[in-house]
């Protein structure tokens, strides 16, 4: 994988002596790829790429976004109108979010239709389903953060759905809203979920998902 000029350098030899990077490079570059693999097997990688774009653009917006019911909408307008390239960053975040959900759905269908969920890859499928749920949760929580009319009523409707569940329904609603009604508590919880809890969860399950794929390889044709 490395050229002779690189492998003969003192810097390379220093790292090789301590980390055995040649063995790591050989393992990465020599993994067998079945001949039946086509472009549809790239959907998972595209989903990951969309997530990385989401992470970068979302992190950039946290410098300007204010998670309060009185300032959230104004801070989003500030990002769009006054921050250098803010309109571009938020637009990329918005469209890559839609693309991530679409690619995730297509990836799930591809795995299901090609039988990639069967033995011995059941746990890979389970972690994938968990990742799908987390991805949708990103969409639900992120949709509310601009705190405009669309975001407010979307949160009100979504958080009110569990009220139909007997006994525990009202408790779940209050837990989701941070109180009896939609307000500052709701926005704070959704912001915390969107920027801290869900990113950590998706990182953990992505790591598990990739390690399993790396260990078991790509499933064979039907």
From Swiss-Prot:
Co-factor binding comment: Binds 2 heme b groups non-covalently with two histidine residues as axial ligands. Binds one heme group covalently by a single cysteine link with no axial amino acid ligand. This heme was named heme ci.
Keyword terms: Electron transport, Heme, Iron, Membrane, Metal-binding, Photosynthesis, Thylakoid, Transmembrane, Transmembrane helix, Transport
Cofactor(s) listed in the protein's UniProt record: heme b; heme c
GO molecular function: electron transporter, transferring electrons within cytochrome b6/f complex of photosystem II activity; metal ion binding; oxidoreductase activity
GO biological process: photosynthesis; respiratory electron transport chain
One GO cellular component, as annotated: plasma membrane-derived thylakoid membrane
Transmembrane segments: 39-59, 97-117, 123-143, 193-213
Residues that hold heme b 1 according to the record: 107, 209
Binding residues for heme b 2: 93, 194
Subcellular location: Cellular thylakoid membrane
Residues that coordinate or bind heme c: 42
Topology of this chain in the membrane: Multi-pass membrane protein
Keyword Zinc-finger included in the entry's annotation: no
Any Pfam family: Cytochrome_B
Domain of life where this protein originates: Bacteria
Similarity remark: Belongs to the cytochrome b family. PetB subfamily.
Note: Heme 1 (or BH or b566) is high-potential and absorbs at about 566 nm, and heme 2 (or BL or b562) is low-potential and absorbs at about 562 nm.
Subunit text: The 4 large subunits of the cytochrome b6-f complex are cytochrome b6, subunit IV (17 kDa polypeptide, PetD), cytochrome f and the Rieske protein, while the 4 small subunits are PetG, PetL, PetM and PetN. The complex functions as a dimer.
Record's function text: Component of the cytochrome b6-f complex, which mediates electron transfer between photosystem II (PSII) and photosystem I (PSI), cyclic electron flow around PSI, and state transitions.
Protein name: Cytochrome b6
Gene source species: Cyanothece sp. (strain PCC 7425 / ATCC 29141)
Phylogenetic classification of the source organism: Bacteria, Bacillati, Cyanobacteriota, Cyanophyceae, Gomontiellales
Gene name tied to this protein: petB
């Amino acid at each position: 994988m490395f050229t002779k000029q690189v492998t003969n350098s003192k810097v390379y030899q220093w790292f090789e002596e301590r980390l055995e990077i040649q063995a790591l490079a050989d393992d990465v570059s020599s993994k067998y790829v079945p001949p039946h693999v086509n472009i549809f097997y790239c959907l998972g990688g595209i989903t990951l790429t969309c997530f990385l774009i989401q992470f970068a653009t979302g992190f950039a917006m946290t410098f300007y976004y204010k998670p309060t019911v009185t300032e959230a909408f104004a801070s989003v307008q500030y990002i769009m109108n006054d921050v250098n390239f803010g309109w571009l960053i938020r637009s990329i975040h918005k469209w890559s979010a839609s693309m991530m959900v679409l690619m995730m759905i297509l990836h799930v269908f591809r795995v299901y239709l090609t039988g990639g969920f069967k033995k011995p890859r059941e746990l890979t499928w389970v972690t994938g389903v968990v990742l799908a749920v987390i991805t949708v949760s990103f969409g639900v929580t992120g949709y509310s953060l601009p705190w405009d009319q669309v975001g407010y009523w979307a949160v009100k409707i979504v958080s009110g759905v569990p009220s139909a569940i007997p006994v525990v329904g009202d408790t779940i609603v209050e837990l989701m809203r941070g109180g009896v009604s939609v307000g500052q508590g709701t926005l704070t919880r959704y912001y915390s979920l969107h920027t801290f809890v869900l990113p950590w969860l998706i990182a953990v399950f992505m790591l598990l998902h990739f390690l399993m794929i790396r260990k078991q390889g790509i499933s064979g044709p039907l």
